[in-house]
Amino acid sequence: LYVRKQLVEKTPDVVINVIDSSNLERNLYLTTQLIDMHVRMVCALNMFDETEQRGDNIDVRRLSELFGAPMVPTVFTSGRGVKELFRQVIAVYEDKEDESPSFRHIHINHGHEIENGIREMQEHLKKYPELRQRYSTRYLAIKLLEHDKDVEQLIAPLGDSAEIFRHRDTAAARVKEETGSDSETAIMDAKYGFIHGALEEAGFSTGDKKDTY
Protein backbone atom coordinates (compact mmCIF):
# COMPACT_ATOMS: atom_id res chain seq x y z
CA LEU A 1 0.00 0.00 0.00
CA TYR A 2 2.85 2.39 0.87
CA VAL A 3 4.59 1.65 -2.43
CA ARG A 4 1.38 2.23 -4.38
CA LYS A 5 0.75 5.54 -2.60
CA GLN A 6 4.26 6.75 -3.35
CA LEU A 7 4.06 5.76 -7.01
CA VAL A 8 0.72 7.52 -7.48
CA GLU A 9 1.60 10.69 -5.58
CA LYS A 10 5.20 11.07 -6.79
CA THR A 11 4.73 9.68 -10.34
CA PRO A 12 8.42 8.82 -10.87
CA ASP A 13 9.83 8.78 -14.40
CA VAL A 14 11.47 5.39 -13.81
CA VAL A 15 11.12 3.01 -10.86
CA ILE A 16 14.11 1.04 -9.58
CA ASN A 17 12.59 -2.22 -8.38
CA VAL A 18 15.02 -3.93 -5.98
CA ILE A 19 14.40 -7.69 -5.92
CA ASP A 20 15.94 -10.05 -3.40
CA SER A 21 17.17 -12.74 -5.77
CA SER A 22 17.48 -15.33 -3.00
CA ASN A 23 13.89 -16.42 -3.71
CA LEU A 24 12.95 -15.19 -7.16
CA GLU A 25 9.58 -16.90 -7.52
CA ARG A 26 8.26 -15.30 -4.32
CA ASN A 27 9.98 -11.95 -4.69
CA LEU A 28 8.94 -11.29 -8.30
CA TYR A 29 5.29 -10.94 -7.24
CA LEU A 30 5.60 -7.19 -6.59
CA THR A 31 7.05 -6.87 -10.08
CA THR A 32 3.84 -8.27 -11.59
CA GLN A 33 1.86 -5.63 -9.67
CA LEU A 34 4.13 -2.88 -11.00
CA ILE A 35 3.49 -4.25 -14.50
CA ASP A 36 -0.25 -3.81 -13.86
CA MET A 37 0.42 -0.21 -12.79
CA HIS A 38 2.04 0.48 -16.17
CA VAL A 39 5.16 2.04 -14.64
CA ARG A 40 8.50 2.22 -16.38
CA MET A 41 10.96 0.26 -14.31
CA VAL A 42 14.39 -1.29 -14.11
CA CYS A 43 14.89 -4.27 -11.81
CA ALA A 44 17.94 -4.83 -9.62
CA LEU A 45 18.41 -8.55 -8.93
CA ASN A 46 20.18 -7.86 -5.67
CA MET A 47 22.32 -10.23 -3.57
CA PHE A 48 23.10 -11.98 -6.85
CA ASP A 49 26.44 -13.17 -5.51
CA GLU A 50 24.64 -15.40 -3.03
CA THR A 51 22.54 -17.02 -5.74
CA GLU A 52 25.73 -17.71 -7.71
CA GLN A 53 27.44 -19.18 -4.66
CA ARG A 54 24.49 -21.53 -4.21
CA GLY A 55 24.89 -22.62 -7.82
CA ASP A 56 21.62 -21.11 -9.10
CA ASN A 57 21.43 -20.42 -12.83
CA ILE A 58 19.20 -18.11 -14.87
CA ASP A 59 19.28 -16.35 -18.24
CA VAL A 60 18.87 -12.78 -17.01
CA ARG A 61 18.52 -11.37 -20.54
CA ARG A 62 15.64 -13.74 -21.32
CA LEU A 63 13.96 -13.00 -17.98
CA SER A 64 14.19 -9.29 -18.79
CA GLU A 65 12.48 -9.85 -22.14
CA LEU A 66 9.67 -11.87 -20.59
CA PHE A 67 8.94 -9.26 -17.92
CA GLY A 68 9.35 -6.35 -20.31
CA ALA A 69 11.85 -4.67 -17.98
CA PRO A 70 15.66 -4.65 -17.81
CA MET A 71 16.96 -6.83 -15.00
CA VAL A 72 20.46 -6.18 -13.72
CA PRO A 73 22.35 -8.51 -11.36
CA THR A 74 23.60 -6.40 -8.46
CA VAL A 75 25.43 -6.67 -5.16
CA PHE A 76 24.84 -3.36 -3.42
CA THR A 77 27.32 -4.08 -0.62
CA SER A 78 30.19 -4.26 -3.12
CA GLY A 79 28.80 -1.94 -5.80
CA ARG A 80 28.63 -4.69 -8.39
CA GLY A 81 26.17 -3.89 -11.17
CA VAL A 82 25.27 -0.43 -9.89
CA LYS A 83 26.79 1.41 -12.85
CA GLU A 84 24.91 -0.84 -15.30
CA LEU A 85 21.72 -0.39 -13.26
CA PHE A 86 21.85 3.38 -13.64
CA ARG A 87 22.81 3.07 -17.30
CA GLN A 88 19.62 1.08 -17.85
CA VAL A 89 17.57 3.63 -15.87
CA ILE A 90 18.83 6.41 -18.15
CA ALA A 91 18.18 4.30 -21.26
CA VAL A 92 14.59 3.59 -20.20
CA TYR A 93 14.02 7.24 -19.28
CA GLU A 94 15.35 8.39 -22.66
CA ASP A 95 13.55 5.60 -24.56
CA LYS A 96 16.79 4.28 -26.03
CA GLU A 97 15.63 0.94 -27.41
CA ASP A 98 19.10 0.03 -28.67
CA GLU A 99 20.54 0.29 -25.15
CA SER A 100 17.57 -1.22 -23.35
CA PRO A 101 15.88 -3.53 -25.88
CA SER A 102 14.05 -5.57 -23.24
CA PHE A 103 11.90 -2.63 -22.10
CA ARG A 104 8.32 -3.00 -23.34
CA HIS A 105 4.94 -2.90 -21.70
CA ILE A 106 3.31 -6.29 -21.25
CA HIS A 107 0.01 -7.55 -19.89
CA ILE A 108 -0.19 -10.58 -17.66
CA ASN A 109 -3.09 -12.79 -18.75
CA HIS A 110 -5.31 -13.55 -15.75
CA GLY A 111 -7.69 -15.89 -17.56
CA HIS A 112 -10.52 -15.11 -19.98
CA GLU A 113 -13.27 -14.38 -17.44
CA ILE A 114 -11.11 -11.94 -15.48
CA GLU A 115 -9.77 -10.35 -18.66
CA ASN A 116 -13.34 -9.87 -19.94
CA GLY A 117 -14.25 -8.18 -16.66
CA ILE A 118 -11.17 -5.96 -16.85
CA ARG A 119 -12.07 -4.82 -20.37
CA GLU A 120 -15.68 -4.08 -19.43
CA MET A 121 -14.64 -2.02 -16.41
CA GLN A 122 -11.98 -0.19 -18.41
CA GLU A 123 -14.61 1.03 -20.87
CA HIS A 124 -16.20 2.96 -18.01
CA LEU A 125 -13.01 3.97 -16.19
CA LYS A 126 -11.51 5.51 -19.34
CA LYS A 127 -14.31 8.09 -19.38
CA TYR A 128 -12.68 9.89 -16.44
CA PRO A 129 -9.55 11.88 -17.44
CA GLU A 130 -8.64 12.55 -13.80
CA LEU A 131 -8.35 8.79 -13.27
CA ARG A 132 -6.50 8.07 -16.52
CA GLN A 133 -3.89 10.70 -15.72
CA ARG A 134 -3.02 9.17 -12.35
CA TYR A 135 -3.72 5.47 -12.70
CA SER A 136 -3.63 2.65 -15.18
CA THR A 137 -7.29 1.79 -15.74
CA ARG A 138 -6.27 -1.85 -16.13
CA TYR A 139 -4.63 -1.71 -12.71
CA LEU A 140 -7.77 -0.19 -11.15
CA ALA A 141 -9.94 -2.91 -12.68
CA ILE A 142 -7.64 -5.63 -11.33
CA LYS A 143 -7.67 -4.09 -7.86
CA LEU A 144 -11.48 -3.96 -7.96
CA LEU A 145 -11.51 -7.68 -8.73
CA GLU A 146 -9.26 -8.11 -5.70
CA HIS A 147 -11.85 -6.17 -3.65
CA ASP A 148 -9.27 -3.56 -2.69
CA LYS A 149 -11.07 -1.19 -0.28
CA ASP A 150 -9.04 1.90 -1.20
CA VAL A 151 -9.79 1.48 -4.90
CA GLU A 152 -13.46 0.77 -4.18
CA GLN A 153 -13.64 4.08 -2.29
CA LEU A 154 -11.95 5.81 -5.21
CA ILE A 155 -14.49 4.45 -7.70
CA ALA A 156 -17.65 4.78 -5.57
CA PRO A 157 -18.26 8.53 -6.28
CA LEU A 158 -18.11 8.09 -10.08
CA GLY A 159 -21.30 8.60 -12.04
CA ASP A 160 -21.44 5.05 -13.38
CA SER A 161 -19.83 3.31 -10.41
CA ALA A 162 -22.85 0.98 -10.18
CA GLU A 163 -22.12 -0.32 -13.68
CA ILE A 164 -18.43 -0.73 -12.88
CA PHE A 165 -19.18 -2.72 -9.73
CA ARG A 166 -21.76 -4.78 -11.62
CA HIS A 167 -19.14 -5.80 -14.19
CA ARG A 168 -16.76 -6.61 -11.34
CA ASP A 169 -19.28 -8.78 -9.54
CA THR A 170 -20.33 -10.57 -12.74
CA ALA A 171 -16.71 -11.41 -13.60
CA ALA A 172 -16.02 -12.56 -10.03
CA ALA A 173 -19.10 -14.81 -10.07
CA ARG A 174 -18.05 -16.37 -13.38
CA VAL A 175 -14.55 -17.02 -12.05
CA LYS A 176 -16.02 -18.66 -8.95
CA GLU A 177 -18.31 -20.82 -11.07
CA GLU A 178 -15.54 -21.83 -13.47
CA THR A 179 -12.62 -22.36 -11.09
CA GLY A 180 -14.10 -22.63 -7.62
CA SER A 181 -11.83 -19.78 -6.51
CA ASP A 182 -12.62 -16.18 -5.68
CA SER A 183 -11.32 -13.57 -8.11
CA GLU A 184 -8.55 -12.41 -5.77
CA THR A 185 -7.15 -15.94 -5.51
CA ALA A 186 -7.49 -16.45 -9.27
CA ILE A 187 -5.50 -13.27 -9.94
CA MET A 188 -2.78 -14.31 -7.49
CA ASP A 189 -2.60 -17.78 -9.05
CA ALA A 190 -2.33 -16.27 -12.54
CA LYS A 191 0.52 -14.00 -11.46
CA TYR A 192 2.45 -16.83 -9.84
CA GLY A 193 1.76 -18.93 -12.92
CA PHE A 194 3.27 -16.18 -15.08
CA ILE A 195 6.31 -15.94 -12.80
CA HIS A 196 6.81 -19.71 -12.77
CA GLY A 197 6.51 -19.91 -16.56
CA ALA A 198 8.92 -17.01 -17.09
CA LEU A 199 11.51 -18.52 -14.76
CA GLU A 200 11.18 -21.86 -16.51
CA GLU A 201 11.58 -20.25 -19.94
CA ALA A 202 14.61 -18.33 -18.67
CA GLY A 203 16.20 -21.62 -17.66
CA PHE A 204 16.11 -21.00 -13.92
CA SER A 205 17.55 -23.80 -11.84
CA THR A 206 18.58 -23.93 -8.20
CA GLY A 207 21.98 -25.16 -7.17
CA ASP A 208 22.69 -27.83 -4.61
CA LYS A 209 25.24 -25.88 -2.60
CA LYS A 210 24.49 -24.87 0.97
CA ASP A 211 23.06 -21.45 1.73
CA THR A 212 25.68 -18.77 2.18
CA TYR A 213 23.93 -16.80 4.92
Identify what each model region corresponds to.
Residues Y2-V72:
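Conserved C-terminal guanine-recognition region of P-loop GTPase G domains, centered on the G4
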Residues V42, E52-D208:
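Alpha-helical transmembrane helix bundles of large polytopic membrane transport and channel proteins
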Residues D211-Y213:
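Structural and coupling elements of P-loop NTPases
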